[in-house]
């Protein structure tokens, strides 16, 4: 795989100013060692504050010395998105801990911890994908555990399988938390 440098990405003429600023922020923070990986995306904040975001960019475009409004907006975005990400991470940890106690009762398998870890690594999955990740457990046991979790309502079918295409499943609660949506299990 060929990786473009940060500078190459940001010089790409097909990217809008908006796209460049969305990419530049986490890449810059990563380059300064403030992020382990450049995965702190501000797009969600920018979308929810779209008008102010566009106003700040337009003001900067019209007056290249008008950095203060943009910087204040950007710092507020970092602060609020960081708080939201921390809230979501805490909710994910809480869900994981609760499922650690529920999975053994539902699956009746000592290997359920491996399945839980694999599901948290890939909340949308197929049985073949999960079976390929958990080498310590035979495929029939993995399928039985997944079916038990489906019957219990923990997992949900996302797409039906057809022909050679496997059905996909999801841990809906984890997907909802990742989107910032509430789950019935707990308020966070």
Predicted segments with their positions:
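Phosphate/pyrophosphate-binding active-site loops
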Residues: 1-89
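Hydrophobic, well-ordered secondary-structure elements that form the walls
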Residues: 74, 130, 142, 168-169
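Short conserved micro-motifs at the rims of enzyme active sites and ligand-binding pockets
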Residues: 85-86, 128, 180-182
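Short alpha-helical segments that sit at the start of domains
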Residues: 87-116
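Short, cationic-aromatic polyanion-contact patches
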Residues: 109, 157-186
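Short acidic, hydrophobic short linear motifs in intrinsically disordered regions
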Residues: 116, 121-134
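Short amphipathic alpha-helical interaction segments
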Residues: 136-148
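Glycine-centered, phosphate/nucleic-acid-interacting loop/turn motifs that mediate DNA/RNA or nucleotide
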Residues: 153
């Amino acid at each position: 795989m060929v990786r473009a440098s940060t500078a190459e990405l940001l010089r790409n003429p097909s990217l809008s100013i908006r796209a460049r600023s969305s990419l530049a922020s986490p890449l810059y923070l990563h380059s300064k060692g403030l992020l382990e990986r450049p995965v702190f995306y501000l797009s969600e904040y920018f979308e929810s504050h779209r008008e102010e975001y566009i106003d700040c960019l337009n003001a900067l475009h019209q007056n290249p010395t008008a950095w203060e409004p943009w910087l204040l907006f950007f710092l507020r975005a970092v602060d609020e998105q960081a708080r939201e990400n921390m809230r979501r991470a805490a909710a994910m940890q809480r869900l994981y801990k609760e499922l650690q106690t529920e999975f053994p009762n539902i699956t009746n398998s000592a290997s359920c911890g491996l399945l839980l870890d694999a599901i948290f690594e890939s909340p949308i999955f197929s049985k073949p994908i999960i079976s390929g990740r958990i080498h310590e457990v035979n495929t029939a046991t993995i399928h039985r555990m997944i079916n038990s979790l489906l019957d219990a309502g923990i997992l949900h079918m996302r797409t039906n399988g057809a022909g050679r295409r496997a059905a996909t499943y999801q841990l809906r609660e984890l997907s909802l938390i990742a989107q910032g949506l509430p789950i019935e299990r707990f308020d966070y």
